[in-house]
């Protein structure tokens, strides 16, 4: 009989490609990488100057002089329908172990387990902020202990400058958080938040900052809206819609 016999275990054609499960895994990984690149490429580009006007993005602000060679600068801004003196008390009482950070509580408590309570009123007992004080981002008992940026300059109703330089040599400022209040008409305030990073930031921290940058920006934007909501509620009655 002519021809070639074939039977169980004998392949008569070329091997097939990856199975459905492997193809799905590859597709998922490709989508995850694309989402990560998009998040780190697009989101920071959109949010790093969220709300800021052209002049506000480049205008010198109190605290800029601490890092004259900054290699990464973000400037966000929001208009608040309240006077600077009505916005200021919400700034000086910030801290996870005080009035909170006015951002997304679900992230602060559900994900990060910070135990934050974001205040909806001004606390007189937390208004005496001074140079050298820490605005806590993590509470005592948290891994690493109570940590956060340190106040290096403040002028009531005008600006609050924080040194955010973990891991830097003593006396070296490699990161700042700068809140600035500008008059915006008879009953308004422009609230600016500028974040500056210097070239001397430790390599490990630079990598962490890059990975977490989208989250930082989203939380910072929510914080500004949270301050706006609270200040407007105290000045003009019902607050606007914002995170709490």
Name what the model sees in each region:
Residues 18-45:
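Hydrophobic alpha-helical topogenic segments used for membrane insertion/localization
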Residues 243-244:
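Acidic, Ser/Thr-rich low-complexity intrinsically disordered segments
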Residues 83-86, 215, 219, 223:
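Short amphipathic alpha-helical segments
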Residues 197-220:
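A short acidic/glycine-rich loop-to-helix N-cap element
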Residues 4-20, 239-240:
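Intrinsically disordered, low-complexity terminal tails and inter-domain linkers enriched
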Residues 47-73, 80-81:
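N-terminal signal-anchor transmembrane helix
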Residues 30, 89-96, 209, 213-216:
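Short hydrophobic helices that act as membrane-entry/anchoring signals
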Residues 2-3, 67, 79, 84-85, ...:
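Glycine-rich portal/gate segments that line the openings of hydrophobic small-molecule binding cavities
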């Amino acid at each position: 009989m002519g021809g070639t016999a074939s039977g169980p275990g004998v392949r008569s054609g070329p091997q097939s490609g990856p199975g459905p499960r492997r193809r799905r895994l590859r597709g998922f990984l490709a989508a995850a990488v694309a989402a990560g690149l998009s998040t780190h490429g697009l989101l920071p580009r959109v949010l790093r100057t969220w709300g800021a006007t052209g002049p506000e993005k480049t205008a010198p602000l109190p605290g800029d002089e601490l890092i004259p060679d900054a290699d990464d600068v973000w400037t966000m801004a929001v208009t608040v329908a309240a006077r600077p003196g009505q916005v200021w008390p919400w700034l000086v009482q910030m801290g996870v172990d005080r009035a909170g950070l006015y951002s997304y509580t679900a992230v602060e408590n559900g994900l990060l387990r910070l135990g934050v309570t974001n205040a909806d009123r001004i606390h007189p007992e937390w208004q005496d902020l001074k140079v050298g004080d820490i605005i806590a981002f993590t509470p005592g008992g948290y891994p690493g202990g109570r940590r956060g940026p340190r106040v290096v300059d403040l002028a009531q109703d005008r600006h609050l400058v924080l040194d955010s330089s973990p891991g830097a040599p003593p006396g070296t400022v490699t990161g700042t958080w700068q809140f600035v209040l500008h008059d915006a008409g008879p009953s308004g305030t422009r609230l600016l938040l500028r974040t500056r990073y210097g070239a001397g930031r430790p390599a490990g921290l630079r990598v962490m900052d890059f990975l977490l940058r989208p989250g930082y920006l989203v939380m910072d934007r929510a914080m500004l809206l949270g301050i706006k909501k609270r200040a407007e509620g105290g000045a003009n009655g019902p607050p606007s819609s914002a995170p709490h």
